[in-house]
Amino acid sequence: MMGQFEQLDQMLTAQEGMLRTSQVVSSGISKPVFYDYVRSRDLDRVAHGIYLSKDSWVDAMYLLHLRFEQAVFSHETALFFHDLTDREPIEYTVTVKTGCNPSKMKAEGIQVFTIKADLHDVGLTTVKTPFGHTVPVYDMERTICDLLRSRSRIEIQTFQGALKAYARRKDKNLRALMQYAGMFKVEKILRQYLEVLL
């Protein structure tokens, strides 16, 4: 028994104070042993199957990713990750496939956009949160197209600021941007904006 607790202690340290039931079970430790461990170490249950030690920081973005694995950070949250805005997002924005029920996320104040399944993975990449965890996010080019596609729900200043910042970037990929714009049917309006900027 003690051997398993020691193993769990090591896992907890390696995971920076966060343990997932599924991860523990797949490492060969039974649920009853794990729940005894949770009680003995006084871990907090922060979400279904996710436990945190008292002294660890909650990485809200990573936690959101673990709980809603198909949600991809997008729109204003993606702008923040790519340094295309100086405004830290007040609420997280994610995109999920059409058909996924977003009510749980919306109830927690997360802004949810939907996209048909065949466009969900376009421009998908990963970034590190401020805590060092890897989460899925859309690249700069996809994000610009998303903002245009959802322009009725986005402040125009946010979009214009992002596009200006993007135009100054050395690592921009205009070819990918125009390719995505065609896929998301925003090519015409994007060209109008780019003609003014570039």
How would you describe each model-predicted region?
Residues 7, 11, 16-23, 27, ...:
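Nucleic-acid-binding surface
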Residues 36-41:
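Basic amphipathic alpha-helical segments that dock to polyanions
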Residues 1-4:
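Short, Lys/Arg-enriched anionic-surface-contact patches
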